[in-house]
């Protein structure tokens, strides 16, 4: 079996996004590399190297294999 990890992004990093992040981290084939949420005032990186953005356009510039959309239903 391949050791390749799928690079994952999360759009919407509130309660649901953070919960999804926890579940994704528990899977050996996936790795969260970037997240975005309007609550972030600027772009940067967390201590573990995961990048964060305040807008989804920057997130989409990442070379992702999958994107989890964790936005409220009304959006």
Please give the residue ranges for each predicted region.
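N-terminal Rossmann-like dinucleotide-binding module
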Residues: 1-47
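Beta-loop-alpha module in the N-terminal Rossmann-like domain of NAD(P)-dependent dehydrogenases
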Residues: 50-75
């Amino acid at each position: 079996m391949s050791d390749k990890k799928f690079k994952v992004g999360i759009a919407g990093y509130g309660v649901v996004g953070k919960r999804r992040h926890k579940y994704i981290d528990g899977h050996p084939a996936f790795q969260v590399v970037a997240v975005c949420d309007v609550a972030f005032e600027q772009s940067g990186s967390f201590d573990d190297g995961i990048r964060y953005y305040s807008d989804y356009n920057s997130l989409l510039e990442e070379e992702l294999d999958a994107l989890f959309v964790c936005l409220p239903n009304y959006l």
